[in-house]
Amino acid sequence: MSERSPVITVDGPSGAGKGTICQLLAQHLGWHLLDSGAIYRVLALAAIHHDVELENEEALTLLAAHLDVQFLTGTEADAIKVILEGEDVTTTIRTQECSNAASKVAALPRVREALLRRQRAFSAAPGLVADGRDMGTVVFSKAPVKIFLTASAEERAQRRYNQLQDKGFDVKIDRLLAEIIERDDRDTNRAASPLVPADDALVIDTSGIGIEDVLKQVLEYVGQKITVT
């Protein structure tokens, strides 16, 4: 598979700063944005809207192939908007109902294949910034620029703790840390699309580094790999 337009992939575990960097990078370049982590939630919500049974693999595959979804950059670091069929569903897809439904549809092989093709269809001029966990290894394996962001589990737990505290949630940081360690183990050791850097990816440890410094490193690397007009 060859990409039709330049693609920058940004992979890494939750809490490493992928979402913020991808948003800022897409804004800076004026490129399209793909939040692959939201795709299954969006499909699940579309299925709910269209009364499609979550066990109906054939109907879900058809729905996935024609999924009308956009990811728009906002004016703030965490302001990526998810638009489904013209409706802002940024908040809706984060509900527990959507999360549970997403887990069900993600288990269907034909649906996964259809969503893989749908994600690749986001590649369009002038370019695409793809945020995910297997963007550089599976979805856009021939992308000219691959970034892998990581950070210590402790750092990521602290970031998540701060986010939840700011939203008024009462959480325990030790529990968040345990969940992150468990998810890391699951993601890196799974048989299909394990969470690992592509062989040709630039790996950046964001522990203790401000977002502007990370963005500077990324932009410098992008400039070394491709010509951006």
Curated annotation (Swiss-Prot):
What are its GO cellular component terms?
cytosol
**Compartmental location:** Cytoplasm
Q: Which SUPFAM superfamilies match?
A: P-loop containing nucleoside triphosphate hydrolases (SSF52540)
Q: Which GO biological-process labels does this protein carry?
A: nucleobase-containing small molecule interconversion; pyrimidine nucleotide metabolic process
From the UniProt record, list the reaction(s) this protein catalyses: CMP + ATP = CDP + ADP; dCMP + ATP = dCDP + ADP
**Positions bound to ATP:** 12-20
Please name the GO terms that the record assigns under molecular function.
Answer: ATP binding; CMP kinase activity; dCMP kinase activity
EC category: transferase
Protein known as: Cytidylate kinase
Q: Which species does the entry assign this protein to? A: Shewanella frigidimarina (strain NCIMB 400)
Which gene is transcribed and translated to give this protein? cmk
